[in-house]
């Protein structure tokens, strides 16, 4: 088996908050960006940037460009805002993973890389928390 017959894999970094979704495909080292897309690149309204529809469109665009550059499969790293903010990914995360698979990309590992504090900064909201 020659060296050029080897399949090329990448990493799909999906940042999904409740305001936006950003998908970046890098090489396996994570140093070189192959392609990226965000909610504002595919929809007009700000409120739709985090929607599953926008995530599906972004994933399809990203998958097409990545396949042109020779990437056949991706390992997925899902990230939410984390730290003192929301620790669960937004609505676009699952739709993006599903759309990547539908676009013909092979999915390797799916990993949650949300930053979780080990008792560092005091969360905002004061002593009694946020009162609604």
From Swiss-Prot:
Keywords: Ribonucleoprotein, Ribosomal protein, RNA-binding, rRNA-binding
Similarity comment: family membership: Belongs to the universal ribosomal protein uS11 family.
Source organism: Methanoregula boonei (strain DSM 21154 / JCM 14090 / 6A8)
Matches recorded under Pfam families: Ribosomal_S11
Ranges annotated as spanning the membrane: none
Assembly with partners or alone: Part of the 30S ribosomal subunit.
PANTHER family per record: 40S RIBOSOMAL PROTEIN S14/30S RIBOSOMAL PROTEIN S11
Superkingdom of the organism of origin: Archaea
UniProt keyword annotation of Signal present: no
GO MF terms held by the record: rRNA binding; structural constituent of ribosome
Gene3D superfamilies reported in the protein's UniProt record: Ribosomal protein S11 (3.30.420.80)
Protein name, as recorded: Small ribosomal subunit protein uS11
GO (cellular component) term, any one: ribosome
InterPro entries in alphabetical order: Ribosomal_uS11, Ribosomal_uS11_archaeal, Ribosomal_uS11_CS, Ribosomal_uS11_sf
Stretch list, region Disordered: 108-132
A biological-process GO annotation: translation
Purpose of the protein: Located on the platform of the 30S subunit.
């Amino acid at each position: 088996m020659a060296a050029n017959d080897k399949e090329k894999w990448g990493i799909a970094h999906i940042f999904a908050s409740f305001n936006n979704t950003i998908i970046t495909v890098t090489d396996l080292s994570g140093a070189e960006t192959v392609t990226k897309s965000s909610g504002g690149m595919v929809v007009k309204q700000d409120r739709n940037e985090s929607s599953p529809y926008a995530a599906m469109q972004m994933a399809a665009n990203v998958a097409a460009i990545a396949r042109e550059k020779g990437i056949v499969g991706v390992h997925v790293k899902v990230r939410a805002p984390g730290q003192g903010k929301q620790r669960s990914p937004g609505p676009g995360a699952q739709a993006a993973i599903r759309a990547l698979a539908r676009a013909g990309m092979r999915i390797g590992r799916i990993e949650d890389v949300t930053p979780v504090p080990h008792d560092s900064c005091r969360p905002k909201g004061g002593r009694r928390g946020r009162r609604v």
